């Protein structure tokens, strides 16, 4: 996986994909900065009146349901439909799905009407979206939904059904991250517990995923693995530097973006802890 990850991240820097993010106002700044740090070019337009034009100029689309309202819903559907028409890969982050009827119905309508190259969320959100189960507390995954070494293969098998049904790649985040498509899955063991102590780490990871997919659209699963693991490595680097400085969560957030902007793809790949497996019968 290390060689594929280096190629994926190098492609991202070479292409500098214009990544159109319709995201939430809590984390838009961090998402834009982490995209710049990884080598992408962000545009954060969310006015329904212009999103079809903006997405037509873009290389990839990321839609994030964090702060939903009627305007952002209209913008999301308009941009995503146009992206599908133009063959521009779209990525969905179903933030907080399961917490409210409006949020859940919006996410399920998107699944019914839009083709997404990848879908990323915490385990609770993915479970609520895929199977109508899962416990949601704000935008944090419930402890009962945690993926562990003991159940990761069983969880991956369930996610495989979802990925196959919607012809997508699914990233379910947690202490262990799972990256699943219809044929294979990867367990990503990179990451820092400090990420759960700031708002926006998941949104940033999804933004990076969208950019990686945009720059590697023929290898979506590999792009998803590389993006997830590389962002996790940046979290580990940021945690170490924060502790060394005696810093807190604001320091960690800054160090996270610093790590993304200074670490070369080869260095990130050296630190990957990824296990890839093919599903039986494939």
Where are each of the predicted segments found?
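Short glycine/serine/threonine-rich phosphate/pyrophosphate-binding segments
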Residues: 25-32, 71-73, 100, 197, ...
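Glycine/small-residue-rich loop that forms an oxyanion/phosphate-binding "nest" at active or ligand-binding sites
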Residues: 72-121
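Active-site cofactor/substrate anionic-group-binding motifs, chiefly glycine-
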Residues: 34-87, 92
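Short pre-catalytic strand/loop immediately N-terminal to key active-site residues, enriched for Gly-Thr
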Residues: 188-200
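Glycine-rich phosphate/adenosyl-contacting loop at the front of the ribokinase-like
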Residues: 1-44
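Charged C-terminal helix
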Residues: 233-282
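Conserved post-catalytic alpha-helical subdomain immediately downstream of the catalytic base
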Residues: 199, 208-254
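Conserved phosphate/ATP/ADP-binding segment of small-molecule kinases
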Residues: 103-185
């Amino acid at each position: 996986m290390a060689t594929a990850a280096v190629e994926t991240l190098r492609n991202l820097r070479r292409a500098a994909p214009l990544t159109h993010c319709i995201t939430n106002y809590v984390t838009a700044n961090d998402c834009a900065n982490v995209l710049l740090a990884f080598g992408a070019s962000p545009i954060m337009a969310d006015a329904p009146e212009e999103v079809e034009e903006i997405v037509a100029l873009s290389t990839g689309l990321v839609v994030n349901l964090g702060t939903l309202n009627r305007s952002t819903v209209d913008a999301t559907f308009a941009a995503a439909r146009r992206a599908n028409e133009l063959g521009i890969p779209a990525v969905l982050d179903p933030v907080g799905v399961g917490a409210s009827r409006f949020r859940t119905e919006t996410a399920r309508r998107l699944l019914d009407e839009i083709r997404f190259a990848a879908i990323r969320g915490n385990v609770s959100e993915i479970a609520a979206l895929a199977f109508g189960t899962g416990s949601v507390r704000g935008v944090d995954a419930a402890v009962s939904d945690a993926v562990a070494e003991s159940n990761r293969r069983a969880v991956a098998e369930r996610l495989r059904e979802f990925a196959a049904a919607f012809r997508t790649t699914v990233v379910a985040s947690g202490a262990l991250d799972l990256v699943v498509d219809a044929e294979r899955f990867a367990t990503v063991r990179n990451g820092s517990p400090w990420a759960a102590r700031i708002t926006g780490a998941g949104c940033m990871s999804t933004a990076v995923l969208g950019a990686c997919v945009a720059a590697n659209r023929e290898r979506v699963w590999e792009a998803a693995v590389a993006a997830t693991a590389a962002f996790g490595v940046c979290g580990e680097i940021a945690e170490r530097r924060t502790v060394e400085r005696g810093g807190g969560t604001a320091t960690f957030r800054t160090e996270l973006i610093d790590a993304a902007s200074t670490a070369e793809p080869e260095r990130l790949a050296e630190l990957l802890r990824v296990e890839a497996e093919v599903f039986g019968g494939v």
